[in-house]
């Protein structure tokens, strides 16, 4: 018997004096784990979504609640886009940003909510692998785009209030179009990078996603291969797409509030504060829930808490945005009255 590297070689002599070498190799713990992972790995064709809750008695009430929210979201955002498109006096950079935000909110909600509603009324919440990756891709595109669109709108408000005489120069039609284009490009690039890294992830036999949609973190928890690069990408992009827009919005509103405080008329000051507070509330809910989900260490994160947090920035905020940004907007009210008046006259 000869010990060679990590194996043991046996010398066996047969009756015809022929010597055979039989070698048995021992695998290291790391090699053993890789071998077991390879054996357990299978090409995943579908996933099972756990949903918001597994309690059957809550499925119908939740279906009705989220159906109502989705209907309001669709009507509010498509109504805002239509109203701005039909009203010539709203064809300005400010309302171009608002129209783009409404489009993003509509798409953001539509990527997730219809599938979730179907899952409420079906016994098996199955989603195919291609469908899951497609949902994840477009979710990331519109979620990231919304982060930067809110920042662009805050900057637009800062220029309008703090530098009104230079507004038409700084926020020209060309600058507005360029900012909107950059917002979508950032969303497409970041989403493509995430999906590209997902192709290197190997999934084990476990195919149950503890979420109501194909969330990035929930999918990575099913991996039986290293997800270090994916997690590093999440950390970097979350910092860029959450912290940078948040700081932009915060600094913009600090200057806006400082300008509002210089307003002499109490009525004008109170209206401006009321408008800003509603905007800040919507932005805080969106970025706060997103940061809770993606900037929290995985060691202390809870998927149940993450699902509740996700509801706010994927479903609730897209419903609230058109209401918040138009509720105290006189131009929108005038445009709505004119549009409804024309329809009544016709």
Swiss-Prot record:
Signal peptide: none annotated. The chain crosses the membrane at residues 61-81, 90-110, 135-155, 175-195, 233-252, 273-293, 307-327. It comes from the Eukaryota. It comes from Homo sapiens (Human). This is Olfactory receptor 8G5. One of its GO terms (cellular component) is plasma membrane. Its main location: membrane. InterPro entries: GPCR_Rhodpsn (IPR000276), GPCR_Rhodpsn_7TM (IPR017452), Olfact_rcpt (IPR000725). The gene is OR8G5.
